[in-house]
Swiss-Prot record:
It comes from Polynucleobacter asymbioticus (strain DSM 18221 / CIP 109841 / QLW-P1DMWA-1) (Polynucleobacter necessarius subsp. asymbioticus). GO terms for molecular function: ribosomal small subunit binding. The gene is rbfA. It comes from the Bacteria. It is found in: Cytoplasm. This is Ribosome-binding factor A. The keyword Cytoplasm applies. One of its GO terms (cellular component) is cytosol.
Amino acid sequence: MHKTSPHRNQRLADQIQRDLAELIPRELRSTSLGLITLQSIELSPDLAHAKVFFTVLGAEPEHALKALQEKAGYLHSLLFKRLHIHTVPTLHFHYDSSVEHGIEMSRLIDQAVESDQQDESK
C-alpha cells in the first residue's frame, strides 16, 4: 500500500476542501439545502477515501447529507477533472455537529452565569 507524506496529504485535503467549497454551491443549487459550509477534510493514508465534514445553516442536516451523498459521485468526477492526480479519493460526507454542540454549551454557560448573578443580587 502506497502512503503519502503528511504534508502532501494535508495539501491535498486543503485543495479538495477549496474545490468542493466552490463546486457544492454551484452544483447543488437547491435553496432548500441552506448554506453548506465545509469544516474539514480527513484523507486516508492511501488517499483512497476522504471524510468531508460539513455544517449547514437554514436547513435540516439530514436533508443536506442526503443531497451531498446523492451527488458524491458527480462531485468526485468534477474533482478528478480539477485535481489532475491519478486517484481522487472517494467522498464520504459527515455532518459536523461540533459547532451546534459548542453553541449549546455556550448557551448553557450563559444561562448558568445569569442564574448566579441573579442569586448574588438577592
